[in-house]
């Protein structure tokens, strides 16, 4: 596989009104913390996002695995378009779309996993309604062990899929991902007919990269991973903020 090139704002057209910007949150806008709850609101980041959104005529969206409630807690802004739970929740300035068809099964899976992982220290099980996330960043549990446990449960659910991320495993609807979220926004104003940029850092962002590539946009992974669909990369979170700073200087 071809190694991705370093992303730079110089690759973009001078008129940023032609662009639509999609941003992951954890590992992209924020450094990854030991627990999702440790991420706190940042006024400077909120102001920066709002300014870029205004420059883009509103064509900026957050594409995250977090729930909408959690994203609202962090960003304190209902004007920015948001996709939560890996595309199972979508909100633009006009409407909210939410996929909850499997929420009952998610609750049952959460109970089963809690029983099977009972006694395992530093494992956080997060039921997000349409999705279920198991965080084990601070645990000594073997990744293969927890992966096997969750696969055994999910394999009997044809409408659900197990997604592996950085020190997390997520059970989510098969029909929704970050790629479908980006496609949804690209069919609506003010994103329509623009060229997309998507910046993310994890395996969970690969569907988004693939979608953006098909639409002739710029797919950017934080960290240079050879096994990625992203065409470009940025070395770290700091470099993402540098790109945002440069966008603020654009016309």
Where do the PLM segments sit?
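Non-catalytic pre-domain segments flanking phosphatase-related domains
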Residues: 1-25, 29-33, 37-40, 44, ...
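Mg2+-dependent phosphoryl-transfer enzymes with acidic/Ser/Thr/Gly-rich catalytic loops
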Residues: 2-4, 16, 174, 181-251
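Residue-level signal for inorganic ion chemistry
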Residues: 27, 82, 134, 182, ...
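Active-site phosphate-binding/coordination module
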Residues: 40-127
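Substrate-recognition/cap helix-loop segment adjacent to the acidic, metal-dependent catalytic center
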Residues: 67-83, 142-161
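Substrate-recognition "cap/lid" segment bordering the active-site pocket of phosphatases
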Residues: 85, 91-111, 163-193
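Charged, glycine-interspersed solvent-exposed loop segments at helix/strand-loop junctions
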Residues: 115, 124-140, 162-172
């Amino acid at each position: 596989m071809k190694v991705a090139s370093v992303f730079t704002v110089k690759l973009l057209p001078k008129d940023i009104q032609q662009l639509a910007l999609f941003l992951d949150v954890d590992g992209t806008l924020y450094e990854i913390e030991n627990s999702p709850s440790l991420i706190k609101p940042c006024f400077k980041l909120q102001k920066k996002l709002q300014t870029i959104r205004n420059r883009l005529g509103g064509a900026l969206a957050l594409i995250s695995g977090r729930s909408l409630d959690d994203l609202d807690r962090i960003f304190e802004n209902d004007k920015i378009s948001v996709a939560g739970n890996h595309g199972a929740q979508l909100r633009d300035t006009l409407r909210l779309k939410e996929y909850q068809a499997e929420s009952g099964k998610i609750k049952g899976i959460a109970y089963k996993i809690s029983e099977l992982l009972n006694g395992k220290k530093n494992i956080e099980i997060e039921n997000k309604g349409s999705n279920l996330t198991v965080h084990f960043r601070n645990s000594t549990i073997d990744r293969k062990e927890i992966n096997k446990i969750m696969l055994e449960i999910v394999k009997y659910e044809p409408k659900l899929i197990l997604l592996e991320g950085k020190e997390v495993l997520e059970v989510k609807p098969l029909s929704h991902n970050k790629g479908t979220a980006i496609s949804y926004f690209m069919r609506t104003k003010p994103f329509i007919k623009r060229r997309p940029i998507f910046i993310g850092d994890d395996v969970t962002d690969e569907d988004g990269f693939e979608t953006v590539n098909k639409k002739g946009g710029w797919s950017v992974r934080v960290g240079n991973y050879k096994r990625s669909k992203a065409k470009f990369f940025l070395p770290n979170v700091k470099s993402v903020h540098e790109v945002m700073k440069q966008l603020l200087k654009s016309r």
